[in-house]
A protein has these predicted regions:
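Alpha-helical transmembrane segments and their helix-start/interface "positive-inside/aromatic belt" motifs
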Residues: 139-151
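Active-site lumenal/periplasmic loops and adjacent helix-entry segments of GT-C-fold
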Residues: 148, 152-273
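Detector for Asparagine
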Residues: 51, 56, 88, 122, ...
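Membrane-embedded, hydrophobic transmembrane alpha-helices
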Residues: 1-136
Length: 274
């Protein structure tokens, strides 16, 4: 496998993991609250909560000195399930009883595997139908806006993404310092050299511990994940503030493509820094 392919696959995996934690997980937890809101508002609500959720989970398990794979998974899953059931008004007790009855019927032979699979397939079909309907109303009915979103993403990857393939390294001299902080968190030392580990360190530590990706490898590619979401948040905020449908896209494109400010304004976008 070539280095370029490895870097692309590594970036795709980290991007998917981070997106799942900060966008998809909150979207599932707060589905009932999010229904009826605009896509920009939904994204900002999910992304803000998702980051704070993961960051505070890391702080909690680190301060309790129980940090590790299973502690992080449990502290993520259990509160997430409880919040999901409370927000979406789903009774966990009734859900467990129904699941237990189905399992009992399968074990007793009163319900065959074909019947169980039929129920599962019907549930999957219902989810797919809702997904197709949502895709139609959110994407197909707003084709021009999604074309502009694609233009923003292409510009973003053209300006910042090429560096991912051309430079195999940290791209900033102080990243080894942040690497040391995160490695100390792995050893259980949250504040090894003063009160410093902010959300960036907590998120990298979580990705390393739960998804088993080396910290140094995450730091080589995570900057592009950061840059992507920084500009998506900027776009979402502008869409909520502007009356014009297309001015936000023009503004973000000018910010990405225009060399309007000092070099230091853009230099931090080229490295995985807090």
């Amino acid at each position: 496998m070539s280095m370029t392919t490895l870097v692309i696959l590594r970036f795709a995996g980290i991007f998917a993991a981070y997106t799942g934690l900060t966008v998809l997980l909150p979207a599932i937890m707060f589905r009932r609250i999010l229904v009826g809101r605009g896509l920009s508002e939904q994204f900002l609500m999910c992304y803000t909560f998702g980051n704070f959720y993961i960051i505070n989970i890391v702080f909690a398990v680190q301060l309790l000195h129980i940090s590790g794979l299973w502690a992080l998974v449990l502290f993520t899953a259990v509160p997430g399930i409880l919040i999901w059931s409370r927000v979406n008004r789903v009774s966990l007790r009734e859900l467990c009883i129904k699941t237990g009855i189905i399992c009992k019927k399968i074990l007793q032979g009163s319900m065959g595997m074909r019947g169980a699979l039929y129920r599962v397939c019907n549930r999957i079909k219902a989810v797919l139908k809702r997904s197709v309907r949502l895709f139609y109303y959110k994407v197909i009915c707003n084709t021009l806006q999604w074309i502009l979103v694609g233009a923003v993403i292409i510009a973003l990857f053209w300006i910042y993404g090429r560096n991912l393939l051309l430079t195999y390294g940290y791209c900033a001299s102080d990243i080894p310092v942040h690497l040391n902080w995160i490695n100390e968190m792995v050893r259980g030392n949250l504040f090894s050299d003063g009160v410093y580990p902010f959300g960036f360190h907590c998120m990298i530590y979580y990705l390393h511990t739960v998804f088993r990706v080396d910290t140094y490898a995450i730091l080589c590619v995570f900057y592009l994940v950061q840059v992507f979401f920084i500009h998506m948040v900027l776009l979402a905020v502008m869409k909520l503030l502007c009356r014009s449908l297309y001015l936000p896209y023009a503004g973000v494109l000018v910010y990405i493509l225009g060399n309007l400010w000092a070099k230091q304004t853009y230099s931090r976008f080229g490295a995985s820094l807090p």
